Regions:
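Pre-Walker A-like glycine/lysine-rich segment at the N-terminus of P-loop NTPase domains
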Residues: 1-50, 60-67
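Conserved P-loop NTP-binding catalytic core
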Residues: 43-130
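Flexible phosphate/Mg2+-sensing switch loops adjacent to catalytic phosphate-binding sites
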Residues: 50-76, 84-87, 168-180, 319-324, ...
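Electropositive, glycine-dotted interaction segments
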Residues: 90-223
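Extended helical coiled-coil dimerization/tether regions that scaffold
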Residues: 194, 202-328
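Walker B catalytic acidic pair
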Residues: 332-334
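H-loop/switch region of ABC-family ATPase nucleotide-binding domains
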Residues: 363-365
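RecA-like P-loop NTPase motor core
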Residues: 371-441
């Protein structure tokens, strides 16, 4: 899973920002007012995993990319068994340092950003056997090249390049950083990331041939077809077709239907599978049963479409448990367009998804989940001018943690969320009951 992410000059984030996400649980929320940068975090991870176009902070236009050096740094807590080969060797070296790195090892300018991560590391150490896990900041910069962000220090250099000749240098050179490419590639290859933005087209997203749906199913349509239409069956089809052509040639005597090459081409497995996908799967659209009728998803309301996406993800993961083992799902505003009465059920479904996947991330304006979700973490994001503040709370004891942070900050934190969370939850439950009464009565 990703316990946090460093962002540098990405969208609303100027300079270096560290956003904590979790101390170990897979249910992770981001809440805060409009414009504070919740969606930017989910989008940046989509850039990291799926090579989407980067959206830079406006400062980069004035100062240039070389000067600002934008980057995205997810900090991964992953089982050692996930990696192998050379990537695992690199991970061993890097993780052994990161598990034990201290504030004194970090450059002075970066120490304030590092403290939140250090607090997380200390908390995580109390809950897991760290010998079973790698802790890895995996960095790509705006050029798509490996980097180490604030971790490019002497301690890390000595671990990764123990026999370096330039003893007086305190960081890895760009050439030395290239050695981490194998680790970056392996992590991105081993973990799948599905991002569901607020403005997603549900009709396209839910088609069977999309990559996202196939990831949720745990296998591709081609893999499914290989089981349903075997090589033996394809061989038999080719034999029958060739027999037909041979018989036709005998009837035509000096004429024959042939391919341009001397070797006559048969129907390939990929040809047949592509035809089946095009003629069978692509024409099928998601429908929802309402009464005795089936309604195509495009005929549903905006709220029903949003609910359908979460329902599909939940049910596919529920019945294909292996598909979620290395899957991170990120949802932007899952409550978008939903009636208040449906919010509670939507977030309950999100929680269940988090139990069957590597991690569930979401950005939301709805606080009603805080009092009722059993386990998980929420990051409250606030902003003053260009400065962001990130406060991570354990949902098992969020009331106590909020109270303590308010005391420690001398009342400077915007923690009216205790009232807002209860208010949102009560509204959702009451309205849901009213809807049931109206339907029954």
């Amino acid at each position: 899973m990703i316990i946090g992410v460093f962002l540098r000059y990405i969208k609303t984030y100027q300079g270096i920002n560290y956003i904590p996400l979790t101390n170990g649980d897979s249910f992770c929320g981001l809440v805060g007012n409009n414009g504070v940068g919740k969606s930017s975090i989910l989008e940046s991870l989509d850039c990291f995993f799926n090579n989407r176009s980067w959206n830079y902070n406006i400062t980069t236009k004035k100062s240039g990319l070389d000067s600002t050096n934008p980057y995205i740094v997810p900090v991964f807590l992953i089982k050692r068994s996930l990696l192998d080969g050379e990537a695992k060797i690199k991970a061993e070296l890097l993780s052994s340092v990161i598990w034990n790195i201290q504030e004194k090892d970090i450059a002075n300018a970066n120490k304030p950003k590092f403290r939140n991560l250090l607090e997380q590391i200390n908390n995580i150490k109390q809950n897991i056997n760290i010998s079973n896990y790698f802790l890895l900041p995996i960095v790509i910069n705006y050029k798509g090249k490996p980097d180490l962000s604030i971790f490019n220090c002497k301690l890390v250099k000595d671990a990764l390049v123990p026999d370096h000749s330039e003893q007086d240098t305190t960081s890895l050179s760009p050439e030395q950083l290239k050695e981490l490419q194998v680790l970056v590639d392996k992590v991105r290859e081993s973990i799948q990331y599905i991002y569901i933005p607020r403005e997603i087209d549900p009709e396209n997203f839910t088609q069977l041939e999309t990559q996202e749906i196939q990831v949720l199913m745990g296998e591709t349509l081609t893999e499914i077809l290989e089981k349903k239409v075997t090589s033996r069956q394809i061989k038999e089809i080719n034999k029958n077709l060739n027999d037909f052509i041979d018989n036709l040639s005998n009837e035509l005597k000096t004429y024959s239907y042939r391919t341009l090459t001397e070797r006559q081409q048969n129907l390939k497995k990929s040809d047949l599978y592509n035809l089946i996908i095009e003629a069978f799967f692509r024409i099928r659209k998601l429908h929802k049963k309402q009464g005795e009728q089936w309604l195509e998803i495009k005929a549903l309301s905006s709220g029903e479409k949003q609910k359908a996406i979460i329902d599909i993800a939940f049910n596919l993961l529920k019945h294909n448990n292996k598909s979620g083992k290395n899957l991170i799902i990120a949802v932007d505003e899952p409550e978008s367009s939903l009636h208040m009465s449906a919010c509670f059920d939507q977030f309950s479904a999100l929680y269940e998804i988090s139990r069957t996947s590597m991690q569930l991330l979401f950005a939301s304006h709805w606080y009603g989940f805080l009092p009722v979700i059993e386990k998980g973490y929420v990051t409250i994001i606030s902003k003053q001018e260009t400065d962001h503040r990130f406060d991570l709370f354990n949902l098992e004891k969020y009331r106590e943690e909020i109270k303590q942070k308010v005391i420690n900050s001398k009342g400077n934190l915007p923690f009216d969320i205790r009232l807002k969370s209860i208010n949102d939850l009560v509204q959702s439950i009451v309205l849901a009951q009213l809807v049931k009464v109206l339907i029954i009565g």
